[in-house]
Amino acid sequence: TLFLHLEALSAALLMIGVMVACVPEGLQLTISTALAVSLVEMARNNVLVKKLAAVQTLGSVTVICTDKTGTITKGEMTASTMWVDRTAIDVSDLWFGDEGQAMIGGVNISPGAIPDMEWTLQLGALCNNGKLVPPTGPGKAWEVLGDPTDAALLVAAKEHGVDPEEVQRASPRTAVLPFDPTRMMMATLHDHDSGTVICVKGALVPVLRRCGSYLSEGRAVPLNENKKAIEDEEASLTKQGLRVLALAYKIVPERPSDLAAAESGLTFAGLIGMKDPPRPEVREALQQAKRAGVRTIIVTGDHARTASAVAKEVGLFDDEGMIITGEELKTLDDGKLSDALDAPQLIFARVSPAQKQRIVSAVK
C-alpha cells in the first residue's frame, strides 16, 4: 500500500484478487486431459481402463503378481500323456476330428486295447463337472462347457472310445466333494454295477496319500513297490510343463454316509498330463514390463516344476530363480517373506487363495 499509494480497502481487494488468481482453476481440466490421453494410448496397446483415476495408479506399478493358467497360458487344456500300469501313452494332438490315436513308443494302439487306460478315462469322465455339447449344425464344432481341465478329460475320453455321457448315465452321481484349493482334489460318489464307486482326481501328493493299492492289469496290487515309479513319472511330466492329475477310486458294497471319511484305502489308477500352451504375446509383454522396470512374480496353485517350465518357456525364469511352495510359505514369517520378495526371479507354487492374498499384501 505504501508503494502503490492504495487505501486499506483497495489493498485488501487487491490481495484477495491475487490469491484467487494464484489458484490453478484449470488444474483439474489439465489433469483430466492428461489422464484421458494416457487412457487412449493404453487402449492402443490393448489395455482397457474403466476408471480414469486408475491410469495414475497403473503408472506407479513396480511389481506384477500373476497367475499362470489362463493368464500366461491360454487356459486351453489338452491331454498330452497318460500313464497307467507303468506305461506312458501318448494321447496328444486330439480335438474331435479323426478317431483318437494313442501311441506307446511311437506305435499306434487301438482304443480299449489297454483296460486300465479305459477305466482311467472313465474315472476322468465321472469325476467331472464339464459337459460336451455336440455340433449344432453342418460345419459346427464340438463345444465343452466347464473348467478347461474337465474339458481335457472329457475330450480324451471321447477320442478314445469312452462316451462320457454314456458312462455318466450308467453310473449316476449321488454325492460330490468339489475341488478345494486346500485339499487339492475332488471326489464324487456313483452308483455302480458292483455297488458304489468313489472317484477321486487331484494333485498327486494328496491323492497318493489316500491310496493303498495300485491298478495293474485290471486288479489291485500293493502300492509300495509302485509308489516311487509313480512319483518319478509325475516329476518327468511336470518338468515338461504339463499339469498332472492323479486319478484313483474305491468300490464299496454300500453307499457311505460321509464321502470325505471314505477317501482312504483308494486304488491308484493313473496319471494324465495336460498341456496348456503359453499365449504367443506373453513373452514380448513380459519383456516390455521388464524394460519399464516392472518385475513379474508368478503366483500359482500348480506344481512348482510345471510353473518353472512354463516360466522358462516365456523367458521369465532360469535356473538361478527362486521357487517357494505353499508348504514352505507357511514356515515364513512376514520378515522372511519380505526378504524373499527381493529375489529378481520368483515363483510361488502350490499356494492357496489365502496365501496369494498374503503375498500380494506383503508386496504392497
Predicted segment positions?
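Conserved cytosolic headpiece of P-type ATPases
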Residues: T1-K364
